[in-house]
Amino acid sequence: MARTRPFDVVLYGASGFVGRQTVRYFAEHAAGLRWAVAGRSQAKLDALRAEFIDAAPGVLVADAEDAAALDALAAQTRVVLSTAGPFARFGSELVAACVRHGTHYVDITGETPWVRRMIDLHHDAAAKSGTRIVPGCGFDSVPSDLGAWLVAKALWQQHDERCASVKACFSIRGGLNGGTAASMLNALDEGVQCQVDDPFLLNPAGTAPADAASHRDPAGALRDADFDAWLAPFVMGPINTRVVRRSAALLAADKLYTPDFRYQEYARMGRGATGALTATTVAIGMAAGRTALGFAPLRRAAARFVPAPGEGPSERAMDQGSFRCELVGVGERGSVQRGRIAGQGDPGNRATTIFVCESALALALDAKRLPGGARRGGVLTPCVAFGEVLAARLRGAGMTIEPFDT
C-alpha cells in the first residue's frame, strides 16, 4: 500500500453516536497519526473538527451511496474505520471502494447476513491484494473471537492439545444506542432470518460439518457447573458464534482446533432459585420477542421505543457500565483451559469504541507484526486479522485479557 496517502486512518460515520466516541479516542490516543473524520454532512463534520481542533483532523465528505466519493475517500487513506450502520444500508459501497484501492477496513457491524454478502463479493479480491477487511470489531465480536482463540492457543502451548470446544459466559451492564437498534431491526426487515439462524453462515464453503444442526443456538435455561451459575441464551450469541466458527475454519492450517470444534455462548443469570427463575424468564422472553419481531408491524412499533440513530446512553451511564466474558475451553484429551476478557464502560459504546479504535490502530501502526504478514488479506475476523497484536493493545488500553489454568 502506498505510503504517500494523505491519511493513515479515516473515521467514517464520525458524527454518529459511536462515531463521536471514536473521534474522542483518536484525539486522545493517536498522536502522530494523520487521521480524518468523514461522513455525508459537511456542516456536522466541520462542527466536529472545531470541537477537536487541537487534534486537527482532516475532513472528508462522502455519501454512503456515492461510489465516486467513496473511491476518492478510500484512495486517500491506509485504513478506514466505519461506525455508519445499519451496514446493509450504508456499508456495502464503502467496503467495495476499500477493496478496489487496497485500503484496510474495520467496522462494528453485527449484521451477519451482510457480512456473508461481503465475503461472497470481496473475500477473494481482498485476499489476492493483501487487504484486510475486518467486520465485527466492536463488542460484537472481539471478546468472543479473541477470547476463544486465546483459549485455544493456550491449550496448544500449555497442554499440547487442539481445542475441541469453548463456551463463553457473559455478564454485562450497559445500554443500547440507536445505531445498534437500527441494525438489529434492519436485519429483520431484510427477511434474512433463515440466514441469521444458520450456525455456519460465515464459514468458507465446504467447511460446515455434516451435523451442523447440532450446533444450533441454545434456546433454554441451563445450570452450568463450570460457571457455577444459571445461564440463559446470550442475545448476541447468534452473531458471535458465527464469527468464532469462521475463525476456526480460516485457521484450520494452524491446527489449534479439532475438525469438530464446538463453540457456544450464554448470559450469566445468577445462582440458586433466583438464578433459575431469571434464566427461564429471559429464555422465554427472548423466544417470544424474536417471534413478535418477525412481524413487520411489531418491528415498526418496537422502533418507537428504542433510541433513534445518533442517540444513546448518557455519559454517566456509559462510564458506569461494564462487561465480563468468561471462557472455558476443553482440549481433545480433556485438558481444561479458562480465560477472561473484561473491561469497564458500557460494552456497546465505551468498550466497542476501544475495540474498534485499537483494531484500526493495529493496522496503522503494527502492520509488520500482524499475523500472516503483509500478504494476509480477505474478509477476515478479528483474531485472524490481529491476533496477539490486538490482545496486547487492549491490555495497554486497560482491559483484562488473561487465559489461566484451572
Residue ranges, per PLM feature:
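N-terminal Rossmann NAD(P)H-binding glycine-rich loop of SDR-like oxidoreductase domains
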Residues: F7-E28
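Glycine-/Pro-rich loop/turn segments that contact NAD(P) or position catalytic residues
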Residues: P86-G206, R246
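C-terminal catalytic/substrate-binding lobe primarily of soluble NAD(P)-dependent oxidoreductases
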Residues: G19, K153-T406
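Conserved Rossmann-fold cofactor-binding substructure of NAD(P)-dependent oxidoreductases
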Residues: L60-V79, T83-R89
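Short, conserved SAM-binding/catalytic segment
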Residues: L48-A55
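Conserved glycine-rich Rossmann-like NAD(P)H-binding loop of the short-chain dehydrogenase/reductase
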Residues: A31-K44
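Structural motif
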Residues: D8, R78-V79, H104
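A short, Lys/Arg-enriched amphipathic alpha-helix followed by its capping loop at the start of a domain
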Residues: Y25-G32, L251
